[in-house]
A protein has these predicted regions:
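Helix-breaking motifs and short loop linkers at transmembrane-helix boundaries and internal kinks
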Residues: 9-14, 210-211
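Cytoplasmic helix-loop-helix junction between adjacent transmembrane helices
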Residues: 19-56
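Intracellular juxtamembrane helix-capping segments at the cytosolic ends
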Residues: 29-42, 228-243
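Glycine-rich segments within core transmembrane alpha-helices of 12-TM secondary carriers
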Residues: 46-67, 254-263
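Helix-loop-helix hairpin linking two adjacent transmembrane segments in secondary transporters
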Residues: 53-102
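Extracytoplasmic gate region of multi-pass secondary transporters
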Residues: 122-167, 174
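Helix-to-loop junctions at the C-terminal end of transmembrane segments
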Residues: 176-188, 271
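C-terminal transmembrane helical hairpin of 12-TM major facilitator-type secondary transporters
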Residues: 190-234
Length: 280
């Protein structure tokens, strides 16, 4: 909430950067604590479904940002009112959560620490799950940020149209989280994880080989659809296997989203050294 209110009341380049920093810190803390909290309040066999639905709600909130900014600019002459509205909503959410009674899973005499978190990386299964998040977040950010340039250079699509590839990808992701929330009530997390991973890998490979721009658009949509549920699936599968370490696992997986900063740099470097197809 502070990250949104600071740039609203003190709008300057420095304050916007400060607000971004606060938003990043706050968002990380919320996700580290909210994921295991959600697992505590939903039926055990529905954790993946509700985690996917939470990603859908998050996507809807992200999508509302641009049209709301346009509305406030047209109606009140100040798009920055968006900061105030989102800040107030954040405060209300904190108050609502603070007054809700939730019975958290606790183990007597056990406390999660930095040491206990990093010690879990010695477990091959947990390490593999954390690396999965590192890679999939990197692919998510890298593909989303480079899809426009890929369409321009690979298929000669006009820039304005090509840059809307991000919207196609985002729509696929949003639809994927909603569909995943429904399907995961009927399909096991492990089976869904296997098939959605296979779909994502096949579509990523296919988009490098196709010669048609129209087919590439379709594949971009399906890549978003496939990647959409990887995060909630990996988290729920890991917590299902190690339920007493859900806080540590949540922290490790939030640390693994650094893949979103590392892998896009690698994609850019390879693209500069050869071409964007090799980078992708």
């Amino acid at each position: 909430a502070l990250g949104l209110l600071v740039p609203f009341f003190m709008y300057s380049f420095a304050m916007v950067l400060f607000g971004f920093a606060l938003l990043g810190i706050g968002n990380t803390i919320v996700q580290v604590s909210a994921n295991p909290l959600l697992v505590d309040v939903v039926p055990g066999n529905r954790a993946s479904s509700f985690l996917s639905f939470s990603q859908f709600i998050k996507a809807v909130g992200s999508m509302l940002g641009a049209p709301l900014a346009g509305f406030f600019a047209a109606k009140f002459g100040d798009w920055k009112l968006l900061f105030l509205v989102f800040g107030i909503v954040s405060i209300l959410a904190v108050l609502w959560l603070g007054t809700s009674k939730i019975t958290e899973t606790r183990v007597e005499g056990y406390k999660a620490t930095f040491g206990s978190s990093f010690k879990l990386l010695g477990n091959n299964f947990v390490l593999l799950m954390v690396l999965s998040i590192f890679v999939v977040v990197g692919v998510d950010v890298g593909f989303n940020s480079n899809s426009g340039q890929f369409l321009i250079k690979q298929f000669g699509i006009e820039q304005t149209a090509a840059e809307s590839g991000r919207s196609v990808y985002f729509f696929g992701r949003m639809l994927g989280t909603f569909a995943g929330a429904i399907m995961l009530t009927r399909i096991s997390s492990r089976s869904f994880f296997m098939w959605t991973s296979i779909l994502g890998i096949l579509c990523l490979a296919a988009i490098l080989l196709v010669k048609s721009g129209a087919v590439a658009w379709i594949l971009i949509f399906f890549i978003g659809l496939a990647i959409a549920n990887i995060w909630p699936l990996v988290f729920s599968i890991a917590v299902e296997k190690h339920p007493l370490q859900n806080n540590e696992i949540s922290g490790l997986m939030m640390m693994a989203i650094s893949g979103g900063a590392v892998i896009p740099l690698l994609i850019g470097w390879i693209s500069d050294m050869s071409n964007i197809s090799w980078g992708m």
